[in-house]
Design a protein with these regions (language model features):
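The structured alpha-helical core of multi-pass membrane proteins
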Residues: 1-214
Length: 214
């Protein structure tokens, strides 16, 4: 899937890009409902917004708390990708999308995962998929794969845009940049960057093998 994603970049994403929005809306709606379902089983998980618990954790389990920061940083780094797309959409649509859909869905799902672990402390691996009912597991896996591909595409597009801007500002030497759309200036393809990204991404996947190792 990863190699295929990079291989089709030169064709542009204009045609398939029309389904990205609806798919992501379904994705965020799904993870929000999954989280809410488990929150209702253990509503006390909402207390985790109180910073007292984080301070208490660091005070009594400093080593474990420090190691847990790795997972926390992995959660928040995805937010940095929003800035890469600022030139495509502008500040207002991104802010509205973040506060109106993305942030509430993520909070509900992470609370739901915490609530699930309260009732199933032995299921500490792949918590997200373990909290999905068995009959819905396959559709959610397919949906998660689609969401991952779309998120990866957003990052690739963002890197292409940043590279093009850096070339225009003479921060990078001139390299080949192809326009893949006759109507949208932002639809570009940078072959050198595309293949360097592919090698780096495949190397990371083979090296770490899981997000927990990362």
């Amino acid at each position: 899937i990863l190699v295929g994603l990079f291989a089709v970049q030169r064709r542009g994403t204009g045609a398939v890009g029309k389904v990205f929005g609806p798919v992501m809306m379904v994705w965020f709606g799904t993870i929000a409902m999954l989280g809410l379902w488990h929150i209702l089983d253990s509503p006390g998980i909402i207390k985790s917004v109180n910073p007292y618990y984080a301070i208490h954790f660091f005070g009594h389990e400093s080593t474990k708390a420090f190691l847990s920061l790795g997972s926390i940083f992995l959660v928040v780094t995805g937010g940095e990708a929003l800035y890469a797309d600022m030139g495509h959409f502008g500040r207002r649509p991104i802010v509205l999308g973040w506060y109106g859909m993305v942030l509430p869905s993520l909070l509900l799902n992470y609370w739901g995962q915490g609530a699930f672990l309260i009732g199933h402390p032995e299921d500490v691996h792949s918590v997200f998929f373990r909290m999905v009912p068995g009959s819905l597991l396959l559709p959610v896996v397919v949906l998660a794969t689609c969401a991952t591909v779309i998120a990866s595409q957003a990052l690739i597009t963002g890197v292409f845009s940043l590279t093009a801007q850096a070339v225009k500002l003479d921060y990078l030497p001139r390299i080949k940049i192809l326009h893949t759309s006759q109507s949208q200036e932002g639809q570009i393809y940078v072959p050198l960057v595309n293949w360097l990204l592919m090698v780096a991404c495949v190397g990371l996947v083979l090296g770490f093998r899981s997000s927990s190792n990362l």
